[in-house]
Amino acid sequence: MTAQLFLTYLVFVAVAVIGISAAYLPRRTTFAIMAGLAIWLVYVGLFSSLGYMRDVSLRPPGIVWVVGPVVLFVVFVARSNIGAGVAAAIPLWLILGLESFRIGVELLIHRLWEDGLVPKLLTYAGGNVDMFVGLSAPIMAWIATRGRLGLRLAMGWNVLGLLSLANVAASSMLTGPLKLISTEVPNVAMGIFPYTFIPGFLAPLAVTLHVLAIRAIAARYRDTRSPASGISALTN
């Protein structure tokens, strides 16, 4: 039952990403996102369903074959003109508000803990504050439209959101297939289908949204230094 709920939510998030891309980005960019997302989801799904994700005998370990490309993609979004274009095209409030999808992810991770598939450390009951990032996302989406102070607060919130993700990622890696630390139950979920889509898609999506938001905020904050451009920038 948990797997069915997870896959349903995964499809919902993926469709939302494609829908927003189609609404705000050029057709060619939207097609590239759709094709790239489809290929990546198939890759992660096959990789995990065949057992490679939890195979610690691989060199490098199976998790690297998923996390490695994700890191390269995030760097591309952070540094490329394409990333800047996407950040400029999608309204800032929408980029920030989309982070609320993390509420559903955290509820599902809590369910996995109840099923004995992840340690309590990865849940909001165990001190994971990522749920609060998701809950505050709609509020921050509104605050970001309130002038330069709002932009500054949104920038700080994004930094805190990235730190929260880094904490969860580190905890997941340490308790994952490599078993670098011991917990009351091992983190087996992240190495099996379909839950490998948490490190393989959902967590990277959260990071990507933060990176896009930071790029958008930086651009808008620069614009507000000019009175004429500041008015138009803050209406987005």
Give the predicted meaning of each segment.
Residues 176-197:
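Short, membrane-exposed interhelical loops at transmembrane-helix boundaries
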Residues 83-150:
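Membrane-proximal helix-loop-helix units in multi-pass membrane proteins
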Residues 24-27, 79-85, 212-228:
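Membrane-interface capping segments at transmembrane-helix boundaries
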Residues 26-37, 90-93, 150-156:
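Membrane-interfacial loop-to-transmembrane alpha-helix junctions, especially the N-terminal start
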Residues 39-111:
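A glycine-rich, hydrophobic loop/mini-helix early in the fold
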Residues 9-19, 67-80, 132-141, 197-215:
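Hydrophobic cores of alpha-helical transmembrane segments in multi-pass inner/ER membrane proteins
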Residues 154-170:
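Hydrophobic alpha-helical membrane-insertion segments
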Residues 1-15, 55-67, 196:
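Hydrophobic transmembrane alpha-helical segments in integral membrane proteins
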